[in-house]
Amino acid sequence: MDSSTAPLSIITKLALFERTCDSSYSPLAENLKYLVQFVYLLPAAMLHARILYILLWKHRNLYLKQSFYILFIMSCIACFTLVVQDIFFARVFQYMTQFCEPMSEFVENYPIFPAIYYPLQQHLHCAQPIIQILLTVNRMSCVVIPWKHSQVWKSFMKYAIALVILTPFLFIWNIIISKKLPVYTFGGFYIGYERVVIWATMTLFMLILRAITIVITAVCTFITVLRLTRMSKRLVSSERTLCIASFLISSCFLGTAAAESLFAFQVVRTSTSISYFLLPISWDILNVGTPIVMVMASSQLRRHVFGILKRSRSNSRVEDGTIVTGF
């Protein structure tokens, strides 16, 4: 099918008001928007990198024994990659309006770049809800079946990793086979796609995935809280940190789900639509908030990340392979 007559995705049709860059936006104002976001995205990327170094290398013998932290590593990798993409590509395309034309020409003339960049971005967005499900189920199983929690997750972990890597392809296959192109908004552009299979919309797929995740998260969280109220104080103390961290990460995730729902159900969009602003901000809250939540929740991880050498025996210890951390 000729590209000029190929059916565009609904989002692309609604967003593609002009096939060229909009020069009416002030480059200075748009550049300042990038600078504001750069101020919090760069420290977030550095924090993610530091956490991954701690978990995967410096203290791997401690953290890799814990199924929760293995799942959290996958979350960190996804968030870190998305933040780096935003710093160097997505936000540059959107807010460096003075370079909009040469950058959009690069995207069109070198299709290998969007063919890698956009599917990877969407793969990671799909992987995040799956990781969220696994994190909440992990915490629930820890309080429901504490006597065999470690053994169950040790056996299941290889399947969990495969699930996170492979399941997103069930949602992004249409993106992979479709043509990627610049979609012009706010004086810049983002990368969209022309759907080869009309009914297979990424918005619909993500909405279904987010809805499933919210239901599972709500059920698992309710069971976890109910079970924690019936456990002994010693066990509650040992599990409280990771459970609270999981709850807070779930809150960040729910904000993203709400923003994506607004974007999906908003029938009429304009170039000044608030949904185009809320969606990336909600992603930022999730990607930036996740490492902050874990560092704030776990005093042990906080000491390791920031290199604080002083150690409190009553506040941090290892018992039977379980990391026990206080606030």
UniProtKB/Swiss-Prot annotation:
Entry similarity comment: Belongs to the nematode receptor-like protein srg family.
Stored InterPro entries: 7TM_GPCR_serpentine_rcpt_Srg, Nematode_SR-like
Gene Ontology cellular component annotations, sorted alphabetically: membrane
Pfam family, any one: Srg
Any GO MF annotation of the entry: transmembrane signaling receptor activity
Protein name: Serpentine receptor class gamma-2
Transmembrane segment boundaries: 35-55, 70-90, 157-177, 181-203, 244-264, 277-297
GO aspect biological process, one term: sensory perception of chemical stimulus
Localization in the cell: Membrane
Lineage, uppermost ranks: Eukaryota, Metazoa, Ecdysozoa, Nematoda, Chromadorea
Membrane topology: Multi-pass membrane protein
Principal localisation: membrane
Keywords from the UniProt entry: Membrane, Transmembrane, Transmembrane helix
Coiled-coil intervals, chain numbering: none
